[in-house]
Amino acid sequence: MTNIRKTHPLLKIINSSFVDLPAPSSLSSWWNFGSLLGVCFGVQILTGLFLAMHYTSDTATAFNSVTHICRDVNYGWLLRYLHANGASMFFICLYLHVGRGLYYGSYTYSETWNIGILLLFAVMATAFMGYVLPWGQMSFWGATVITNLLSAIPYIGTDLVQWIWGGFSVDKATLTRFFAFHFLPPFIVTALVMVHLLFLHETGSNNPTGIPSDPDMIHSHPYYTIKDILGFLVMLTALASLVLFSPDLLGDPDNYIPANPLTTPPHIKPEWYFLFAYAILRSIPNKLGGVLALVMSILILAIVPILHMSKQRSMMFRPLSQCLFWLLVAVLFTLTWIGGQPVEHPYIIIGQTASVLYFLIILFLMPMISLVENYLLKW
């Protein structure tokens, strides 16, 4: 008798996507991050749902409702810190996932890559709106500064900002709509993830060598499901350790002060996972130029497939490109550090140098070094 998982209309979709899915036999642990993102996303939706049951999106009570969740709700502190640190874990996995795609040339699957960029923008917008909800000092001033960037858009900028605020400043209307929009995008992200996987399964997975692996495929289950479960355990252990031992390590102390429009924090900054983009924004003295650089720092990923000049797909056998890739990683770490520092010497010049290097490496140096490697292959 034919197995039900291969004949049932619903089960056969799951079967072809996760169980009998052919996968290259050489996938390394860098291919674990897609499934880890799925687990992180599940944790975020569950904890977010329970937090939404107790949270109130009103400027008078928002801060107190978060305090109430931590003090009075059964395991509310656990929900709150799982959600906050789960976002950090989500972005760690996300950046490693994108980095893997850049290193091994997965961006040549352009549909999957472009949906991934859309996902990145959607997740970043969701996380930003979530940061506003506790209504602490950094929430309020972060929302004010970041939304104000839209005023750099010619003609419609100021009207657009006031439309988003729902008034002439960040206030009750802003908080209410940010809560609504923080709750909605995760479901849009879920749909985009399905499209992302649909396009991925059309082409099949890339592998570390970058060479077509059609003659050498294995079943995803049990081989890669076991490997994924190990990844889940490692990541959930790291998340549990962070939540239980040092829940405020990645947060900002200013967010434990209730929002006050009359007092500005000494240094306004977003969450740590946006600091690299924030540093690029601040490194340009012109407002519109800074906003364009901020958007381009992420959107530049969309033109990476066009800039691929190498005859080889993966960087596995391209030592010169590898050096540039790790230089890019170092630049991103530098930008993240600079984004958290005050705007003063020597941080300004370091940030500007790192920002120039970031765009220089992706737009010019990587394509040029690929052409050099192509030339060396002829020898």
Swiss-Prot record:
Predominant location category: mitochondrion
Keyword Calcium attributed: no
Gene for this chain: MT-CYB
One GO BP: mitochondrial electron transport, ubiquinol to cytochrome c
Cofactor: heme b
Record carries keyword Metal-binding: yes
GO CC entries: mitochondrial inner membrane; respiratory chain complex III
An example molecular function term from Gene Ontology annotations: ubiquinol-cytochrome-c reductase activity
Protein's UniProt name: Cytochrome b
